[in-house]
Amino acid sequence: MTIIEGQLVANEMKIGIVVSRFNELITSKLLSGAVDGLLRHGVSEEDIDIVWVPGAFEIPYMARKMALYKDYDAIICLGVVIKGSTDHYDYVCNEVTKGIGHLNSQSDIPHIFGVLTTDNIEQAIERAGTKAGNKGYDCALSAIEMVNLDKKLRER
């Protein structure tokens, strides 16, 4: 039996981050967490590109373009969608989730899902660096692990 696990060493990785400007109070904290996680595990600042998009709905489009135009090892997708009183929340959450999922099934690099979908702003704040940790940081670790898993599979 062979067990393959990814490591959290990120020397010489090139990482793209696409982040939503909508709910920037929270997405900026997710971004800080992601960058912190990447730097702490060996990614250099010059190997991190950050692209801001207007809202969460635009994340899959830009993530696809980033994968097409640059030689990234992974792309981290960060955003926040907070439930309101209309169905708009459901539509945005569904389409962003499907879009990033589609990229993962069609692309040769991992696209990490870091879009918070919460019932209220308090839940979003909790997941952006307070009670529930920082999901941006968690996404950075997921990106590193997935890139390393991919390398190990290719080497077999």
From Swiss-Prot:
Residue numbers binding 5-amino-6-(D-ribitylamino)uracil: F22, A56, F57, E58, V80, V81, I82, F113
GO biological process, one term: riboflavin biosynthetic process
Pfam family, one: DMRL_synthase
Keyword terms: Riboflavin biosynthesis, Transferase
Residue numbers annotated as active site: H88
CDD domains on file: Lumazine_synthase-I (cd09209)
UniProt-listed Enzyme Commission number(s): 2.5.1.78
GO-annotated cellular components: cytosol; riboflavin synthase complex
Residue intervals passing through the bilayer: none
Any one GO molecular function term: 6,7-dimethyl-8-ribityllumazine synthase activity
Family assignment from sequence similarity: Belongs to the DMRL synthase family.
HAMAP family assigned to the protein according to its UniProt record, in alphabetical order: Lumazine_synth
Function of the molecule: Catalyzes the formation of 6,7-dimethyl-8-ribityllumazine by condensation of 5-amino-6-(D-ribitylamino)uracil with 3,4-dihydroxy-2-butanone 4-phosphate. This is the penultimate step in the biosynthesis of riboflavin.
Name listed for the protein in its UniProt record: 6,7-dimethyl-8-ribityllumazine synthase
Organism field: Streptococcus agalactiae serotype V (strain ATCC BAA-611 / 2603 V/R)
